[in-house]
Amino acid sequence: MKIYTYHTPERVPADWQPDCAIAVDVLRATTTIATALAAGAEAVQVFSDLTELEQVSQQWPAAKRIRVGERGGKKVAGFDMGNSPAECLPERVRGCRLFMSTTNGTRSLERIQASPLVLAAALVNRAAVAEFVQKHQPETVWIVGSGWEGSYSLEDTVCAGALIHYLWGQQDAPLETLAGNDETIAATALYRYYQDDLLTLFHHSSHGQRLLNLGNEADLKYCAQVDILAIVPWQVSPKLLTKA
């Protein structure tokens, strides 16, 4: 197995696809996706374009659809939910399909949609995703962070490092043999440094600061938890995720 880490979807190679691609947007899209599916949502369908989301969701029964829209950390006017995992209560999402568009995370999922195996990971479901990857043993794995509008993010990199660290622990080999690029080694180092204080890292990050300024400290605390959900969101058709 070779693991390649890319900090943003813009950094992903255009001329080849891995056997497995994992999208990461810890604050907050992939955390919300995992939480919604764990709470009983039927599926999450992602869109980069809000207009397309509205058109497609109109074809779904109103009682069974939830429109999730976020731009700049804020809920989009007229949508049912913003991009907060705290809104994904079982009584609200059970049996429903979430139609979701966010500033960053949904772009990552769209960028890797052609890969044979597409997963969504966050810290909350880190072990579940890593065990799923370990079981399937893909030869090449991409971990694709979402960043913020094309720029690097600490929180996605530390989550990539958490995944790599877990997978590395299942291998009888040095990290260099698992790493496909230097970013994989750097992400692992970041996680090893902050693994016992992830919330502090989130407070240092630019997007963490952005969410704090919007009054979303509870989301940061939730998203900083590790291995609390035994859920693996995987793509069953382009841009449509259910639990594996």
Curated annotation (Swiss-Prot):
Gene3D superfamilies (alphabetical): ComB-like
Catalytic activity: (2R)-O-phospho-3-sulfolactate + H2O = (2R)-3-sulfolactate + phosphate
Pfam families reported for this sequence: 2-ph_phosp
Cofactor(s) for this UniProt protein: Mg(2+)
Protein name: Probable 2-phosphosulfolactate phosphatase
Family stated for the protein in its record: Belongs to the ComB family.
Keyword Hydrolase attributed: yes
Organism annotation: Thermosynechococcus vestitus (strain NIES-2133 / IAM M-273 / BP-1)
InterPro entries: ComB-like, ComB-like_sf
Enzyme Commission number(s) of this protein: 3.1.3.71
Domain of life, source organism: Bacteria
Any GO molecular function: sulfopyruvate decarboxylase activity
UniProt keyword list: Hydrolase, Magnesium
